[in-house]
Amino acid sequence: MKQLQILLAVLFLSNAAFAAEGQHLFILSGQSNMGGLKPEESFIPTVEKEFGKENVIVVKDAHGGQPIRRWYKKWKSAKGEAFKGAGDLYVRLMGKVNAAIKGQKIQTVSFSWMQGERDAREKHSAVYAASLQGILDQLAADLGRKDINFVIGRLSDFDMQNKRYPHWTAIRKIQVDFADASPRGAWVDTDDLNDGKNRRGKDISNDLHYSAKGYVEFGRRLAVSSIALIKGKKVSAGDK
């Protein structure tokens, strides 16, 4: 009994120490495949198991079928064309983030991003990397931090021949290169998540969207990679 009391005391003190240092903020955003992710299925349980429920804040805001210009305020096409209303979804996202962190001390910030399908279809790969950096710069400025970790969900193997989405493989490569180039970045593989049965019970194979089980695994992979980065470990997509 005494040993149990000591163990409980140690666990309590550990959690109290985490709380004193601040909350771990996880921001999830993107288009439809982020929209299909239910954080409560695997992402939240994974990060709460690692850091404690009381030390975690998770904010998700996604919108299906949208290009990256709706998050990046200064987006321009390769021809220099601007987009009216650029960044409106980022503003919506930050509205949720600011409400969630009001009065909280934030220890770490992790950004999970699943997007790129629309830009692949519209052939905007030439400005995709700059747009990713632009979003991270916006987050850094708005949150007053230079230590934001990020995890990118790489586009799946849906259109490896670039038939329907001409820049599909180009954006896949950009996502990998962008994450690999940063000590605070990681990417997760989604090639095995779009087969099986979707949430409506329909059989799918190499689909644009993920299976019901695929979304659960996707959330877990994002969480595992986020945790590793918080601990200062550089992870690869193979670390599933």
Give the role of each language-model region:
Residues 20-240:
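Cell-envelope and extracellular/periplasmic
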Residues 2, 18-19:
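Intrinsically disordered, low-complexity Ser/Thr/Pro-rich regulatory regions
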Residues 10-18:
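Hydrophobic h-region of N-terminal signal peptides that target proteins for export
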Residues 2-9:
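Sec-dependent signal peptide recognition
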